[in-house]
């Protein structure tokens, strides 16, 4: 067994700690123990495919608010990283599935954060192989998304090229599920669901319209821009508020896309709440016939300003959802990370309004590190994961989950102020948490 995983007697000393800390109200807190970690350096780049347009051999031209064609001609103020740079950064991990034998499917998001600055960021997902003992990450395979058969229902950045690779100005992929030989990807611009084959070729793009309601964000390509003075209508999904999480049923038939931000009710002019909680919609989609169910569940946020990071089902209808605040760092900066949790939910456990019960949680700002495995050290035996966007969680085995950050390269500096975050991957022992009732 790997030394990083062989905690031995030390784990038994934490047995009492791993029992739930009951609270008078709400879900119980369970302990999480660091078992292993690996890192992919922030400055990891991939070459664009040979058949991609020449302009995609460099990325980051539009991140300063204007065009910068000179390589390394502008520096990101948060991290000092100079851009644009040759190649495509391997960053922005925004969805994960464990494939077994330390192999993981990881989705990269739209690139540099929004539609306007990411037209030279290529969309991709990767199969990564972890060497937990060495703390290193191998890139087994990279799949770039493309639309050679002209399936996408709107013009794309590379519209008139032969290969028609997709970019971060076309979609913002934030969640992924393997289904058979293909993959379904949840997007935030539409929000859309996108099916691609094993080579990344788009097979279909499905709009969101459960119950006959069209879900549209401000970035939806079919959103009409009103004339001056006119009221904007038809926008009910927040910008960067689409399918940040998307779970898959154990039988592989149903997807459960989860909005990152609350649905906007045009009639009331307010974000959706039930009782005293701001809620996020959990939808149902049948992959066999590509249709939406009318069923809607609701995930209750602990704070209206929070967001979710990922959602995966691991047993029956039981699943894991990351909920986080929008802050980073644990070094005393003005807006430090404070709320980074993973909640246990069950799709079969809702109230009369369809609001999910939060059964239990772990705190990613309070991870036990009895074996001192944290690569930059822990404080008083506690390891923290103080990233603004933590967007990856999945079950690895009966007692273990994998968690990873979206490092928003080169802008996030959660681990160390002024230094671009690496892609960090951790294994957590959460045996009691996974069994919580």
List the model feature ranges, each with a label.
Residues 1-6:
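Bacterial N-terminal signal peptides that target proteins for export
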Residues 21-437:
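Sequence/structural signature of beta-propeller domains
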């Amino acid at each position: 067994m790997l030394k990083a995983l062989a905690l031995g007697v030390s784990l038994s000393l934490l047995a009492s700690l791993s029992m739930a800390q009951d609270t008078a109200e709400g879900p119980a807190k369970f302990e999480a123990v660091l078992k292993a970690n690996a890192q992919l350096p922030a400055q990891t780049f991939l070459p664009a495919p040979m058949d991609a347009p020449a302009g995609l051999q460099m990325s980051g031209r539009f991140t300063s608010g204007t065009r910068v064609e000179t390589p390394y001609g502008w520096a990101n103020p948060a991290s000092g990283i100079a851009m644009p740079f040759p190649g495509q950064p391997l960053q922005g991990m925004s969805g994960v599935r464990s494939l077994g034998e330390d192999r993981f499917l990881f989705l990269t998001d739209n690139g540099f954060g929004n539609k306007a600055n990411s037209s030279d960021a290529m969309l991709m997902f990767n199969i990564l192989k972890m060497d937990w003992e060495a703390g290193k990450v191998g890139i087994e395979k990279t799949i770039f998304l493309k639309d050679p058969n002209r399936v996408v229902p709107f013009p794309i950045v590379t519209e008139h090229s032969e290969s028609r690779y997709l970019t971060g100005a076309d979609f913002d992929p934030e969640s992924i599920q393997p289904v058979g030989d293909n993959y379904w990807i949840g997007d935030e611009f539409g929000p859309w669901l996108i099916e691609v084959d094993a080579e990344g070729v788009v097979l279909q793009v499905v709009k969101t319209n459960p119950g006959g309601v069209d879900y549209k964000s401000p970035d939806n390509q079919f959103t009409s821009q009103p004339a001056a003075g006119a009221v904007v209508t038809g926008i009910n999904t927040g910008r960067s508020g689409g399918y940040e999480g998307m779970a898959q049923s154990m039988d592989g038939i149903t997807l459960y896309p989860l909005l990152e931000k609350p649905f906007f009710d045009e009639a009331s002019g307010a974000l959706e709440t039930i009782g005293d909680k701001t809620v996020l919609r959990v939808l149902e989609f049948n992959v066999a016939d590509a249709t939406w169910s009318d069923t809607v569940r609701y995930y209750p946020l602990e704070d209206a300003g929070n967001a979710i990071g990922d959602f995966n089902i691991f047993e029956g209808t039981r699943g894991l959802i990351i909920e986080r605040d929008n802050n980073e760092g644990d070094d005393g900066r003005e807006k430090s990370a404070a709320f980074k949790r993973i909640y246990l939910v069950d799709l079969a456990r809702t109230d009369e309004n369809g609001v999910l019960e939060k059964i239990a949680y772990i705190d990613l700002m309070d991870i036990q590190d009895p074996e001192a495995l944290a690569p930059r050290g822990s404080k008083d035996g506690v390891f923290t994961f103080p990233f603004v966007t933590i967007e990856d969680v999945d079950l690895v085995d009966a007692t273990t989950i994998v968690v990873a950050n979206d490092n928003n390269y080169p802008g996030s500096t959660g681990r160390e102020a002024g230094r671009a975050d690496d892609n960090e991957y951790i294994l957590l022992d959460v045996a009691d948490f996974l069994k919580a009732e």
